[in-house]
């Protein structure tokens, strides 16, 4: 078969008409320098602040410095094989992490990838790590409690849902223990928890995860990990990633609790990044925006009103408020709370729990110093019974501290002073609590009632612990319905007062401690 020239030219014209060129524009640049996880890129003309930049080897960097002729970015992951001259591309996306109920019970890294060997995540979607905090109109006042299970905290420094309460103290004073016990105490409360470990040893984090699992609290907890061996960029971003995971529950009308352990290490990681990016250093060599580093993170912890939740869920959830409660941890050096980062975080948060080395070494654990620990908004969230019974405890301890200092110089003391000193010592002993042994509202209320109404007056100081243990065993055995009623209602009236008095009178008669 022969084709003439006309047919050939027609076929060629048809093929040309059908030919479709799909052009794909890439904003591409070249690495001009690599140093300690920070790369400088030339040629990225349309790069956003915080944008993900695609690197060779399925890795990403985040653009932090946008300069006239170059972009400074931090690499998320290993950077030893990156070299000058390598091509990189803008992605047009801000960093996002997986969020949803499928993350509960899982251990993930800063980027949301599972590291617990339990298979892939079943996430509900993705959320940007950087988000704007809810506005003033979208918030609701804090009036519901978060029970930590610690007598000294729930009585004197109460925490409310949507509050930011700082845990501050030197190393080895029980900061992490307090936060982990608060998470364990939420296993039956319906509050979802997020634990963010920043710059810690992998063995320490493994121990925390094991303890959460042993006490049945891992099932409603997400653990976000950026170990000490990971890059400064991942340590800097870990709290924001954890916050995005917690906001998923807040925005859907649920309650969540997030622990940042600890923000001192995040500030150090951010200082390292900033100095490598050649940003001008300020006080203690921190960059000028280190206050904003923590304020934009902690302002995202809030209680949002029902209108906000309804608008966010497009009407699916109605009449429910959501909350994200934050427990940031700060490590001080030799008890110096006037250093740069501690003062910043104290001014941002709604109160602080100050843990003291001297108290810890004296066996008073949790080592809470009630004198300078404060909760600025939690009082409104306390249950009625705790509010009624805790006032006397704080006063007794304040008077005891004052008299204890004075009595060191006075040889002879009158009976009233001796009684106050004795009462203060017994209350201090009563507030001691073992780790991983959180107490219910009813148990705390009963113990505080015993202290306030003078039932400890004839109990020896050395037997306060056994008195408490025997009392709790007695009520669990013989008065469980009353304990259940107090736990559910949190109310306080003459009837409940009479019942508590009756329980203590009958228990004291047994002399079983």
Swiss-Prot record:
It catalyses: ATP + H2O + 4 H(+)(in) = ADP + phosphate + 5 H(+)(out). Its EC number is 7.1.2.2. One of its GO terms (cellular component) is proton-transporting ATP synthase complex. Keywords: ATP synthesis, ATP-binding, Cell inner membrane, Cell membrane, CF(1), Hydrogen ion transport, Ion transport, Membrane, Nucleotide-binding, Translocase, Transport. It holds the Pfam family ATP-synt_ab. The record marks 373 as: Required for activity. It is found in: Cell inner membrane. ATP binds at residues 169-176. PROSITE patterns: ATPASE_ALPHA_BETA. GO terms for molecular function: ADP binding; ATP binding; proton-transporting ATP synthase activity, rotational mechanism. It is an enzyme of class 7 (translocase). It is a peripheral membrane protein. F-type ATPases have 2 components, CF(1) - the catalytic core - and CF(0) - the membrane proton channel. CF(1) has five subunits: alpha(3), beta(3), gamma(1), delta(1), epsilon(1). CF(0) has three main subunits: a(1), b(2) and c(9-12). The alpha and beta chains form an alternating ring which encloses part of the gamma chain. CF(1) is attached to CF(0) by a central stalk formed by the gamma and epsilon chains, while a peripheral stalk is formed by the delta and b chains. Belongs to the ATPase alpha/beta chains family. Produces ATP from ADP in the presence of a proton gradient across the membrane. The alpha chain is a regulatory subunit. NCBIfam families: atpA, PRK13343.1. This is ATP synthase subunit alpha. It comes from Klebsiella pneumoniae subsp. pneumoniae (strain ATCC 700721 / MGH 78578). The gene is atpA.
């Amino acid at each position: 078969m022969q084709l003439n020239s006309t047919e050939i030219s027609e076929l060629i014209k048809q093929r040309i008409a059908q030919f479709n060129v799909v052009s794909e524009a890439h904003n591409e640049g070249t690495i001009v320098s690599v140093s300690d996880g920070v790369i400088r890129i030339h040629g990225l003309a349309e790069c956003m602040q915080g944008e993900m930049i695609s690197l060779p080897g399925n890795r990403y960097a985040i653009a932090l410095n946008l300069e006239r002729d170059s972009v400074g970015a931090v690499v998320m992951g290993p950077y030893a094989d990156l070299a000058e001259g390598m091509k990189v591309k803008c992605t047009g996306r801000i960093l996002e992490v997986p969020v949803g109920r499928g993350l509960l019970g899982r251990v993930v890294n800063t980027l949301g990838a599972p590291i617990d060997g339990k298979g892939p995540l079943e996430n509900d979607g993705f959320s940007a790590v950087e988000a704007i905090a809810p506005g003033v109109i979208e918030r609701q006042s804090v009036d519901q409690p978060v029970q930590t299970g610690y007598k000294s905290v729930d009585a004197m420094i109460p925490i409310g849902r949507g509050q930011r309460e700082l845990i501050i103290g030197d190393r080895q004073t029980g900061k992490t223990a307090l936060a982990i016990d608060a998470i364990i105490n939420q296993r039956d409360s319906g509050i979802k928890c997020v634990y963010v470990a920043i710059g810690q040893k992998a063995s320490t984090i493994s121990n925390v995860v094991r303890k959460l699992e042993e006490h049945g609290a891992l099932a409603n907890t997400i653990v976000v990990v950026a170990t000490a061996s990971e890059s400064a960029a991942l340590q800097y971003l870990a709290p924001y990633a954890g916050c995005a995971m917690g906001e998923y529950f807040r925005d859907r009308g649920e309650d969540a609790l997030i622990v940042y352990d600890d923000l001192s290490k995040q500030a150090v990681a951010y200082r390292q990044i900033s100095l490598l990016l050649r940003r001008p250093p300020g006080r203690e060599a921190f960059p000028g925006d280190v206050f904003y580093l923590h304020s934009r993170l902690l302002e995202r912890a809030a209680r949002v009103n029902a209108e906000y939740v309804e608008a966010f869920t497009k009407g699916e959830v109605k009449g429910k408020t959501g909350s994200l409660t934050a427990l940031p941890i700060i490590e001080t050096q030799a008890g110096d709370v006037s250093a740069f980062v501690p003062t910043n975080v104290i001014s941002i948060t709604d109160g602080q729990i100050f843990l003291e080395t001297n108290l810890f070494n004296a066996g008073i654990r949790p080592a809470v110093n009630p004198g300078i620990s404060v909760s600025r908004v939690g009082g409104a969230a306390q249950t009625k019974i705790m509010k009624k019974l805790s006032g006397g405890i704080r006063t007794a301890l304040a008077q005891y501290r004052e008299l204890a200092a004075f009595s060191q110089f006075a040889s002879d003391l009158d009976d009233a002073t001796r009684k106050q000193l004795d009462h203060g010592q017994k209350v201090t002993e009563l507030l001691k609590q073992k780790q991983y042994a959180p107490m219910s509202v009813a148990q705390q209320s009963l113990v505080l009632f015993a202290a306030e109404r003078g039932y400890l007056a004839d109990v020896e100081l050395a037997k306060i612990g056994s008195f408490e243990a025997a009392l709790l065993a007695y009520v669990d055995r013989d008065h469980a319905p009353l304990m259940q009623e107090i736990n559910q209602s949190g109310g306080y009236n003459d009837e409940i007062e009479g019942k508590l008095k009756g329980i203590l009178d009958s228990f004291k008669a047994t002399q079983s401690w």
